[in-house]
Amino acid sequence: MNGGLLVAGTTSDAGKSVVTAGICRWLVRQGVKVAPFKAQNMSLNSFVTRDGAEIGRAQAMQAQACRVEPTAHMNPVLLKPGGERSSQVVLLGRPVGEMSARGYHGGRQERLLGTVLDSLAELRGTYDAVICEGAGSPAEINLRRTDIVNMGIARGAGLPVLVVGDIDRGGVFASFFGTVALLAPEDQALVAGFLVNKFRGDVSLLEPGLDMLHGLTGRRTYGVLPFRHGLGIDEEDGLRVSLRGTVRESVVAPPVGEDVLRVAVCAVPLMSNFTDVDALAAEPGVVVRFVDRPEELADADLVIVPGTRGTVRALEWLRERGLADAIARRAAERRPVLGICGGYQLLGEHIEDEVESRAGHVDGLGLLPVRVRFDREKTLTRAVGEALGEPVEGYEIHHGVAEVTGGAPFLDGCRVGRTWGTHWHGSLESDGFRRAFLREVAAAAGRRFVPAPDTSFAALREEQLDRLGDLIEHHADTDALWRLIESGAPQGLPFIPPGAPA
């Protein structure tokens, strides 16, 4: 078998990432050696591979679904937004510079097609099947000429295309039809059919519409996936990241102790790796809320200032909203505060930034004895250490170099009183350390909260991935899906007018 498939979507957040992961997990359970691939990802949620390459966090999650180690070839182009109109371009795991959207789509993107096709060929030469994820919609007619992630990669590699639509939003039939009808004939010939995502109710009520869609397009529907809570793992930061006010709470089990523990995460601009708090939200009795007002910190037992692609901008935002003063008051009252990566940097005394914001000298919040200087060379590394008497693993992704001048050691950073800071993403996924940290927070907050002794974040993640595989196995036509991956799109698929504009 030397198969492949592109999972496209009618919109951003249609479910491409989780459907791709589900197909990967289903295939690996059939004994197929499979890998994920996304030619170009725009995300602030990233991950560091074992050899120090930066890729999208979603592709790392999909690699886990495949039970393989993630590599840079699985996400050769990563765009990390730094503002409304520019992004850092990460090529094969290494940053190569900042670029405006106009500059990127004006020619640079098209020149990267060869690079992404080479990465895909590398994977296809190693694995039995490669399941590719598209981005946004393949029918973005203004971007088709320079597309390297949807029909550009499908046509370049001869991949069949499965279009995913989120029926929970409404309008899925128009979205399916319109997506195909706006593609050029050569692109339409690769679109094999559709997959309905997030359906609620009786599937028999949907079947007449699916039959009509087949009559209109000549393309079949490969499955109807039911709506399932708790499967938005390692989400990208498109539509889902309107996080202000969002609550993440464990659905695993009730609290072990008498009290819950309330965690407030400051929803700073350009928030990166907000998945850091998923391990907290998986703990029974921990309620995580994303906040943007100082009064929302009042009843929080722990405040987290998360990572951000714009440390200085986040610092300004905290000050403008009154959150900086509220955090400083908490620290003075010895109420728990945790800064991660950019959040750690802004808790320090001084920031010198001629790289990210080019703001030069900026005063931090002064809560930790740390001085930060931004370096053009990005730190990308896996980290292993110990804190609170427990082993910890994490990873670092940052331009800021921190000089710690005091306080008590805490991972790579420090702590003063009940204020902690570290560059390490992912540290809270280490179960023993997470429990020890939550015990400290609960004691400082006066809460009768007890961490569950047996919560394994890695095991919960595996359960989630298995549930995604189950969705495909039980609710998709897996025989037809297998043929599609192995043999490509059916021959003779009809053209749906009007096609792509000239």
From Swiss-Prot:
Keyword Metal-binding: no
Associated pathway: Cofactor biosynthesis; adenosylcobalamin biosynthesis
Gene source species: Streptomyces coelicolor (strain ATCC BAA-471 / A3(2) / M145)
Active site feature: 341, 425
MF terms in GO: ABC-type vitamin B12 transporter activity; catalytic activity
Domain GATase cobBQ-type: 260-433
Family the entry assigns: Belongs to the CobB/CobQ family. CobQ subfamily.
Functional summary from the UniProt entry: Catalyzes amidations at positions B, D, E, and G on adenosylcobyrinic A,C-diamide. NH(2) groups are provided by glutamine, and one molecule of ATP is hydrogenolyzed for each amidation.
SUPFAM superfamilies from the UniProt entry: Class I glutamine amidotransferase-like (SSF52317), P-loop containing nucleoside triphosphate hydrolases (SSF52540)
Gene name as annotated: cobQ
Source taxonomy: Bacteria, Bacillati, Actinomycetota, Actinomycetes, Kitasatosporales
Alphabetical keyword list: Cobalamin biosynthesis, Glutamine amidotransferase
Protein name as annotated: Cobyric acid synthase
Pfam hit, one: CbiA
PANTHER family to which the protein is assigned, alphabetical: COBYRIC ACID SYNTHASE, DETHIOBIOTIN SYNTHETASE
GO biological process: cobalamin biosynthetic process
